[in-house]
Amino acid sequence: MDALNSKEQQEFQKVVEQKQMKDFMRLYSNLVERCFTDCVNDFTTSKLTNKEQTCIMKCSEKFLKHSERVGQRFQEQNAALGQGLGR
């Protein structure tokens, strides 16, 4: 990023932030869709049953832990790749 001037750095940072927000929204949407589909079965009432609430909590925790693990592995791969290129 040293090759970019101040304005270019700001524009680049803005693009990165927009991508991060888009990725976060995609993650959130996938979480909602998956857990709703897997856990909500009773449409006779507007409230969740205790079973549905428990399922949603477990589903969301599992989904977020999985996403965190994937992110960590991605960072590890990037670090390894960066070290390989830095030789």
Swiss-Prot record:
GO biological process: protein insertion into mitochondrial inner membrane
Pfam families noted in UniProt: zf-Tim10_DDP (PF02953)
Outcome when changing S60P: In tim9-3; impairs the import of mitochondrial carrier proteins into mitochondria
Sorted UniProt keywords: Acetylation, Chaperone, Disulfide bond, Membrane, Metal-binding, Mitochondrion, Mitochondrion inner membrane, Protein transport, Translocation, Transport, Zinc
Annotated signal peptide: none
Entry's Gene Ontology molecular function annotations: metal ion binding; protein transporter activity; unfolded protein binding
Effect of E52G: In tim9-19; impairs the import of mitochondrial carrier proteins into mitochondria
GO cellular component: mitochondrial inner membrane; mitochondrial intermembrane space; mitochondrial intermembrane space protein transporter complex; mitochondrion; TIM22 mitochondrial import inner membrane insertion complex
Membrane topology listed for this record: Peripheral membrane protein
Localization: Mitochondrion inner membrane; Mitochondrion intermembrane space
Function of the molecule: Mitochondrial intermembrane chaperone that participates in the import and insertion of multi-pass transmembrane proteins into the mitochondrial inner membrane. Also required for the transfer of beta-barrel precursors from the TOM complex to the sorting and assembly machinery (SAM complex) of the outer membrane. Acts as a chaperone-like protein that protects the hydrophobic precursors from aggregation and guide them through the mitochondrial intermembrane space. Compared to TIM10, it may have a strong structural role.
UniProt family annotation: Belongs to the small Tim family.
Domain note: The twin CX3C motif contains 4 conserved Cys residues that form 2 disulfide bonds in the mitochondrial intermembrane space. However, during the transit of TIM9 from cytoplasm into mitochondrion, the Cys residues probably coordinate zinc, thereby preventing folding and allowing its transfer across mitochondrial outer membrane.
Name by which UniProt lists this protein: Mitochondrial import inner membrane translocase subunit TIM9
Source organism per UniProt: Saccharomyces cerevisiae (strain ATCC 204508 / S288c) (Baker's yeast)
Gene: TIM9
